[in-house]
Amino acid sequence: MEIGFMHNMLIYHGSNTAVENPRILVNGHYKDFGYGFYCTNIEKQAKRWALTRHGDSIVSRYQYTSNAQLKICQFSEMTEEWLQFVVECRSGIEHDYDIVEGPMADDQIWDYVEDYMAGKISKAAFWELVKFKYPTHQIVFCTERALETIHFEGSDIL
């Protein structure tokens, strides 16, 4: 885990609507990195997110501009720290980061995380099961200050 700086980048959000003014939605579903507005720098992944929604499938594009004043947590790969962070966030434990970036636990990986949390598989078995998964990426904007770093560039209907 690194705490620090992220470079400017183009990011995507897949949904059933164009999201010109992103918001942090707090609902009962705990996600990998807690509550926030989730994006990715992998356009194909955003398309997959959009296609899983009911109704239209839309990918919104944003320009992220770095802000050194924000508290940012980055995971460059799935590590022990990443696993512990995901387990805590998925259990409802809050963190104080403005932005969190790293790999995502898709549905299959989340099944493995649940099995690990329940003691059904060992940590070693978890790592063996996830090591052959395709690369994923997510960046979550957890605070209003963090949302100020992204600018809506447009959207595409799939």
Ranges and model annotations:
Residues 2-7, 19, 31-32, 48, ...:
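Conserved NAD+-utilizing ADP-ribose enzyme module
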